[in-house]
Amino acid sequence: MTQTPVKIAVTGAAGQICYSLLFRIASGSLLGDTPIELRLLEITPALKALEGVVMELDDCAFGNLVNIEIGDDPKKVFDGVNAAFLVGAMPRKAGMERSDLLTKNGAIFTAQGKALNDVAADDVRVLVTGNPANTNALIAATNAVDIPNNHFAALTRLDHNRAKTQLARKTGKTVNDVRHMTIWGNHSSTQYPDVFHAEVAGQKATNLVNEAWIENEFIPTVAKRGAAIIDARGASSAASAANATVECMRDWMGSTPEGDWVSMAIPSDGSYGVPEGLISSFPVTITNGKVEIVQGLDIDDFSRAKIDASAKELADERDAVKELGLI
């Protein structure tokens, strides 16, 4: 019996992140040999460019990619999808107020949330990469009234990966030696990369690095890495964001490695004092697609203040989109 293809929607499909992401998905980085059908959404002016991307996907002759559909109508593109990568978003431009950014993205994610609600498969998982990712995910989830909130998440895996690399470099080890890294809060400069539970080659990270490095180098480097990449290459991180996006959804559709956890922004259940309903990053384990927040971690005063500050920013963003009538 022929296996039914998994339908995967990707928005902003002609953009920079997707120029890396689509080829990773199609080559099997997400679901291995499982047959897939790509559903690609773009704004009308970008459809011509998207046709060129589809030509390149065709020219790769990926064995598990059985079909590609493109369009500018989310209700058509999202029909029956099992996974949705919401990558397309309005970037903040010079002189743009935060409320303008939230309004413009609010319109995008309101429409996409409603479309997913109406036509996506019952098992759909929705991962938001387009920034401000946490609040965009909240808007989409709130407008998808029939889809459980725990089917929505925002990407903090890129921050998680950045943090692992910085700790591995500092300790002279490899990223494979680093376990139990945690990102808390918002995917913004208030995020809190937490090494206090991390291990490097079986040793507590805090026995290998000092607090001055953690506070003055590690946290700012991870939190501001996106800006540093823009300064260096004149464009935002795309390939690394695509890689993290694939890794996050791959784990979400499967399981995290035994004995480790990952970071993922999901609707808070009140754990660690993060107000319920905010889409905030937590340490999570995943077993056969079921996501659970790691419980019982000791949070010292330093970490408490950092987690609270990022949660406050998320609450402020939620309140702002409420005032704008988006949720």
UniProtKB/Swiss-Prot annotation:
Q: Which Gene Ontology terms describe the biological processes this protein takes part in?
A: malate metabolic process; tricarboxylic acid cycle
Q: Which reaction does it catalyse?
A: (S)-malate + NAD(+) = oxaloacetate + NADH + H(+)
**Which branch of life, at top level?**
Bacteria
**Record-listed substrate binding positions:** 92, 98, 131, 162
Q: Which GO terms describe its molecular function?
A: L-malate dehydrogenase (NAD+) activity
PROSITE patterns xref list: MDH
InterPro entries given in the database record: L-lactate/malate_DH, Lactate/malate_DH_C, Lactate/malate_DH_N, Lactate_DH/Glyco_Ohase_4_C, Malate_DH_AS, Malate_DH_type2, NAD(P)-bd_dom_sf
Q: What is this enzyme's EC?
A: 1.1.1.37
Query: Do you know which SUPFAM superfamilies this protein is assigned to?
Result: LDH C-terminal domain-like, NAD(P)-binding Rossmann-fold domains
User: Which first-to-last residue range defines the signal peptide?
Assistant: none
Quote the Pfam families the UniProt record gives: Ldh_1_C, Ldh_1_N
Q: Which UniProt keywords apply?
A: NAD, Oxidoreductase, Tricarboxylic acid cycle
Q: Which residues form the active site?
A: 187
According to its UniProt entry, the function of this protein is described as: Catalyzes the reversible oxidation of malate to oxaloacetate.
Output the NCBIfam families linked to this UniProt entry.
MalateDH-SF1, PRK05442.1
Concerning its family, UniProt says:
Belongs to the LDH/MDH superfamily. MDH type 2 family.
UniProt protein name? Malate dehydrogenase
Q: Which organism is it from?
A: Cutibacterium acnes (strain DSM 16379 / KPA171202) (Propionibacterium acnes)
